[in-house]
């Protein structure tokens, strides 16, 4: 390839679609197979993020309470895009003193603004897919989507129908698959959609 003969040049390939990135670099059928070192970036630590947010608000003569920051980081799961979106919305509101109540209100407004888009998703999914999507959102992380406990708790169908719904949601990138120390789990891809579904 053109990359191999280049000296003193480093390439960084990044993307949020883990399945696609894994396929590009770990599949022997792909031209980039085994050509890179894979690095997974964990979320920014809550301590570092809290300090950063507080400093940015203070630089602009605004004060945000530690409780408000804590709620933002928990609600956005420290995902950079969603954290920035909430903070930018709060900042644009012009308030000089931001507490947890104003943060909760702002989060609700963000979800309300996107409700029409979220409702459109329902038309793109079958009943089983929508019910499974809601169940995954309400759980946050689902390690055993075929377990009797999960199916019963959310009044879902048979394990076979859940397998089909799960595959469809993964293909449509409505949910994603991830691995942590507890094993493989599924979560809703769009965090704002996930939080909106929790309210339903």
Residue ranges and their predicted role:
Residues 18-36:
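Short regulatory helix/loop adjacent to the ATP-binding pocket of P-loop NTPases
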Residues 116-200:
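C-terminal leucine-rich, beta-strand-based interaction scaffolds used for sensing/assembly
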Residues 1-17, 26-28:
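Conserved Walker B catalytic segment
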Residues 7-9, 34-37:
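Short glycine-/polar-rich loops that comprise or flank the Walker A/P-loop
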Residues 16-20, 44-46, 90, 193:
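Conserved nucleotide-binding/hydrolysis micro-motifs of P-loop NTPases
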Residues 54-117, 127:
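Amphipathic alpha-helical "lid/sensor" segments that cap RecA-like P-loop NTPase cores
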Residues 37-48:
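Conserved AAA+ ATPase "SRH/arginine-finger" region at the nucleotide-binding site
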């Amino acid at each position: 390839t053109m990359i191999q003969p280049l000296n003193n040049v480093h390439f960084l390939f990044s993307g949020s679609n883990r399945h696609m990135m894994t396929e590009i670099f770990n599949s022997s059928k792909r031209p980039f197979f085994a050509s890179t070192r894979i690095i997974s970036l964990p979320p920014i630590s809550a301590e570092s993020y809290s300090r950063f947010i507080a400093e940015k608000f203070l630089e602009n003569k605004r004060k945000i309470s530690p409780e408000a920051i804590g709620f933002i980081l928990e609600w956005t799961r420290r995902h950079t895009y969603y954290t920035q979106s909430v903070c930018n919305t709060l900042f644009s509101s012009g308030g000089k003193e931001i507490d947890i109540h104003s943060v909760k209100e702002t989060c609700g407004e963000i979800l309300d603004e996107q409700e029409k888009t979220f409702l459109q998703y329902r038309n793109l999914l079958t009943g089983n897919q929508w019910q499974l999507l809601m169940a995954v959102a309400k759980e946050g992380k689902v390690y055993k989507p075929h377990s009797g406990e999960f199916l019963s708790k959310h009044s879902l169908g048979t394990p076979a129908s859940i397998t089909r719904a799960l595959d469809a949601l993964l293909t449509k990138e409505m949910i994603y698959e991830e691995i942590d120390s507890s094993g493989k789990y599924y979560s809703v891809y769009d965090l704002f959609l996930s939080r909106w579904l929790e309210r339903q």
